[in-house]
From Swiss-Prot:
Protein name from the UniProt record: Xylulose kinase
Organism: Klebsiella pneumoniae
Swiss-Prot/TrEMBL site (Important for activity) positions: 6
Record lineage: Bacteria, Pseudomonadati, Pseudomonadota, Gammaproteobacteria, Enterobacterales
The reaction(s) this protein catalyses: D-xylulose + ATP = D-xylulose 5-phosphate + ADP + H(+)
Entry function: Catalyzes the phosphorylation of D-xylulose to D-xylulose 5-phosphate.
Family: Belongs to the FGGY kinase family.
Keyword ATP-binding: yes
Amino acid sequence: MYIGIDLGTSGVKAILLNEQGEVVASHTEKLTVSRPHPLWSEQDPEQWWLATDTAMKALGAHDSLRHVKGLGIAGQMHGATLLDKSLQVLRPAILWNDGRCAEECQLLEDKVSASRQITGNLMMPGFTAPKLLWVQRHEAAVFSQVDKVLLPKDYLRLRMTGELASDMSDAAGTMWLDVARRDWSDEMLAACDLSRDAMPALFEGSDVTGQLRPEVAQAWNMPPALVVGGGGDNAAGAVGIGMADAGQAMLSLGTSGVYFAVSEGFLSKPESAVHSFCHACRGRWHLMSVMLSAASCLDWAAKLTGLASVPALIAAAQTADESAGPVWFLPYLSGERTPHNNPQAKGVFFGLTHQHGPAELARAVLEGVGYALADGMDVVHACAIKPEAITLIGGGRARYWRQMLADISGLQLDYRTGGDVGPALGAARLAHVAVHDEADRPGLLKPLPLEQAHRPDDRRVAHYAPQREIFARIFSKLKPLMS
């Protein structure tokens, strides 16, 4: 049996996987976020450990853990966990969604002119490196004591095994990794007055990084199981649904929208805010576009139009009057990441007349989210990635919307179920691979069951193509007014 642990922002999830790859038990412990100042977002690493300990004991109360062979860890990326020479935490961890260090991002790019080539990414406040520069500039007494910097999930690893280690996919989100070489960049570290000595050892996602310490194994009533590298949340989530090899891609419809495509080599397009990271699978990389408001636009629109729920919104969209004329919706309610990298981008309805009501607005929102998702997919494909299959995760029972997305993108989308387990499943699967031979990986990381293939309708593709062009022109014209 195998365990996967996912340290999320809102909770710690632990799952138990059997030899057939089936989830037999699961438990989640909630976490809270501290926001002591505007833009700040922090958590106490000790709370991570206490929640993990509680989740593991609850898992053991549901099913015996005495036959567990391996344990994998996934988690929220980019967080800065600062330790002193005694490996004690110096301050609350600064999280991925903390926005205090925009100025430090520019300073780092000025210091290292090749930073985008080295890291494959634009410097953004969410990443780890600018957080350390902020600490150096604003909390000098804390920075002077920093001996080690760990990512959130790797702090759990330290408590479990006593080892200082990370995996390639999570390390790629620090902006200290030379992503093409899969190694720390001395130049990027030096820009933060750090060196390799402050960094954990690097491993692939299915590499063994240590064993559970005897006292931890005893507390959890399990053997001293192997602990593997694991992965950052997006990479581990992709592994969980079988995205392990070049030519595979997934479109995830959550609060935000993420398009994740696997490659066999390092590719990048930082000028379009495409993320380029190492994958959690050996010898693989991935590109990722991020739309900040996807399903959250549907929640917002349901309230705006007075419809009872998102399903009601989607049902209303299907009754929209075709003769009323088109309405465009810019879905930038939280700014936008890919491809615009514009935190000032705003949501807009354009084209309203007396003929438009709630149903037409509902359809416009679904289409607008689709146009923005397709924009992100297009810039990823412009990096010379040609996915053989795109798995669609999320979207609930909204067959109408899923087909609309296929028609807007002009690409087949394979809707698969079972992806709701999340990154914990990928972490457990990586542990499963570690215990077996690497050659067995394809059989152990099979795709989830296919429920429906959404093939684009040529007539609807032709309808949406000019609508997408107008969508892009509306944003271009309004962009100067959004700052």
